[in-house]
Swiss-Prot record:
Its EC number is 3.1.1.1. GO terms for cellular component: extracellular region. SUPFAM superfamilies: alpha/beta-Hydrolases. This is Carboxylesterase. It comes from Thermobifida fusca (strain YX). Belongs to the type-B carboxylesterase/lipase family. GO terms for molecular function: carboxylesterase activity.
Amino acid sequence: MEIVIRTGSGDVRGSKENGIAVFRGIPYAEPPVGAHRFTAPRPPRPWDGVRDATEFSATAPRPPYPEAIGALLIERFIPGDDYLTLNVWTPDPNAVGLPVMVWIHGGAFTNGSGSEPVYDGAAFARDGVVFVSFNYRLGIIGFADLPDAPSNRGLLDQIAALEWVRDNIARFGGDPGNVTVFGESAGAMSVCTLMATPRARGLFRRAILQSGAGNMAVAAEDATTIAAVIAHRLGVEPTAAALAHVPVAQLLDVQQQVAQEIQGAPDPAVWGERIAGGSVLLPFAPVIDGELLSQRPAEAIAGGAGHDVDLLFGTTTDEYRLFLAPTGLLPFITGDYVTTHLAKSGLDADAAKAYTAEGRGEEPGDILASIITDQVFRIPALRIAESRVDAPARTFGYEFAWRTPQLDGILGACHAVELPFVFRTLDRAASLVGTNPPEELAETVHNAWVRFATSGDPGWPAWNPETRSVMRFDHPVSEMVTDPYPATRALWDGVPL
């Protein structure tokens, strides 16, 4: 059954699927091609007639994941240039005032799309939510800092998508005044950034941070260095005008080289002392440009930004195992390597013993995975919560602790494992969660997200600095836990991240 809805740019034709109206590939901006590859997003040109919106649009240009991780996180690749589009699932386009949830995908700001199978919005629509997902520019195209182009183009795309939601979602049954924006990993970092920037103020009422916070931002001088190296390797000037003519495949090749070098052991002769010293973890990420961002998002939120936004935040128990276990690196990590990493991170060598004492690792590889889980994910998220103690809006915390049996159980409750539970798409994620994951847990997690989007209350007490209580999601029992892993949490007090 076909359904036609009039948007601000023209009519779109969706389809009825199991009682839910679904619209795919609706443009929220013009395709970023040719001279417009690096410009700010431009409103879509109005069209005559009815535009077909029954199939997903192209996905943003991106490289494949490394093989070991790509076997677990299945991506959908759809070729084409018209990828600044969004998708809508609605229970009833004729309804009035339904809650809206807008999903921002993760992928280190270099991978992912709004059309991945695990992000199907049908379960949210079945539960009375108008669900929206979208694509945004990634990698060099979205985040390389160039003097003749706006910075943070990927973020500008996200804001444009939210503005489309504000202007159009009522036509799909949604309430533009009750929007929850949520994301995972780089998507959660994006949400935190949107909370921090005045440009996005008023576009959403609630936010969910899944495994990402506000500490990932690239300093302007580092962004300039990265752009210069990219251009040098491509044999062009470090400008948008020059890079606009470079074939996408070449951009992606250099993008992968740059990411591997910066995340490995960057040569100071190439990258300078700052980047060689670890100033950049994600080379393609929000840039502190003095316009969209004047400081790191975490600092802006500590100063009061986003304090009127209800917040649900959390992490998985074993985040970083996704990046160490599938590659086979865990058994080869030595105690000396852990000690060196602790020293670089500002912690004493004895910190490793605290991780073992709290049951977070016996072998060096397991200890390192827990340390980096805290360093990159858990502690930054807790610092966001701590900075909102006096906020008028409420803050709620969770920990996702269910351990996947995949790879003989060595992944644990790794990064991204909660996604098919949130979306109730367990059948789309067997590579990550196995063939018999607990559907009851998916129902519990998903329903909490729906409750939060509907009312601002996920169903458990708000986070506070006295008890630090969070909901620990696991099977067969999900329960409130007071101050998880307090000793290793305290190790990071006062340590810059």
